[in-house]
Amino acid sequence: MKKPLVGIIGNSYKIDNKYPAQGSGTINIEAIAEVSDALPVIIPSLPNYFTIAELLYSFDGFLFTGGRPNVHPSFYGEKATDAHGFFDIDRDQLVLPLIKACEKVGKPILGLCRGFQEFNVAFGGTLYPEIRDLPGRMNHRMPPEGTLEEQFALRHEVIINKNSIFEQIFGTNKVMVNSLHGQGIKKPGKRVIIDGYANDGTPEALSIKDSIGFCLAVQWHPEWNASSDKVSKPLFQNFGENLRLPSN
């Protein structure tokens, strides 16, 4: 049987700080291939080389990955400051209209970390540049030193709304997640439903009201240990199931 084709949004970087390149973390590819049981294809964040319509026609679903650059605040009506970090305008120009287009036609999409923030901005929401600077909030960034296992370790609890799609997927309304982000949702976008919060009030899971297809995003990185983690695995499995629906 033919497997669904999933476009994994790539990130810009430089090999040896010189040669421009596009890529994605191997764990994103493994999660799609092993848990969603789909064919992963990296889509370069170079919007001049293809149209949104071409992407919609070519792929069965999309994974909006994390990435170090932040969404440029001009896309949510604010000016850039030092606190906003650095940006990848090409990725912004690709993903923001792609998210809206996918949601409109019911194409399955899953957002992770930066992808979570992109979902919110795509629907008119805004972001805080640095969560840890807000009163009463904890530091959601990963430890600056340590192994990958230490940096991606489970860090805090997320309280999931009862009767939400996430509670249905996880089978519980309390989950433990990793945390590797600086920014976070300030104002939810139109139709954005916050389905889960960290104990300090930081939004951690979202869905889109009245969406006709799978349209979910989380602030953490479920791609880490996706084949074994009791939260990550059902999320990617459910994504894979939705990729195979006849309506897709």
Which residues are covered by each model-predicted region?
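N-terminal beta1-alpha1 cap of cysteine-dependent amidohydrolase-like domains
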Residues: 1-110, 121, 128, 132-170, ...
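Conserved G/P- and acidic residue-centered "switch" motifs that form tight phosphate/ATP-binding loops
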Residues: 113
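The feature captures the ABC ATPase H-loop/switch
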Residues: 116
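A short, structured beta-strand/loop element
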Residues: 212-214
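Active-site-proximal beta-strand elements of phosphoester/diester hydrolases
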Residues: 216-219
